[in-house]
Amino acid sequence: LGFTAQDLIDHQERLEAQANEAFPYHVDVCTHTRGYVRQLIYACKTCGGGGVCMGCSVSCHSDHDLVELFHRRHFRCDCGTPNLYRHRPMTPYKQKTGYPEGAKPCSLRLHDSNKGWDIPNDENVYTKNFDGQFCVCQRGQHYDPETEKEDMFQCLVCEEWLHESCTSLYPKGATKPLISQDDFDTMICNACVRKEKTALLQAYLGQPGWLVVLPNENGWEVVGS
């Protein structure tokens, strides 16, 4: 259909530029009214695992246990919606209202017609990252940014976070990474390259401007330039 891997990267860069222009990191504005957009998201473990925008992370959840997820595409702020409390146990009250007892409206939307409350965000997608779990390894199941010593990268396609060593950029026992961080701006993980719906990416493996780490008889090698 005339769609290339470079188109994917160009589209992502346009989304980032639009997001930075639309949401210039204002902490006094909730982005909920803008709908499903690509933006910086924080998962609130205190409230129940929903995701909130930067403004709400500061104005409504500043003293809560937050997980910084960085950019998420097609996501609407959960503050003031039932999604914010998605992990809270079901009670008669929650079954009737959609909210647990003690739930609070979004403080940045109190003057809106719904007084800071809103309907569920049915299109939001929640990965394990929202529960504070990252990467595909055992270490990532209990991720702590205060103690994590290894660099992590976010896949352009699935937006999952992976340890440098888990992408084979830094094989076990190596003294330096196979590909320096100075040599790339974007990463696409192995799982996304192998998916049928993104198979077009495989045509670019090893092409100019597309570095790929592949296994060989001695371990790993870098193909491309």
Where are the predicted features?
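PHD-type zinc finger and closely related Cys/His-rich zinc-binding mini-domains in nuclear regulators
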Residues: L1-S225
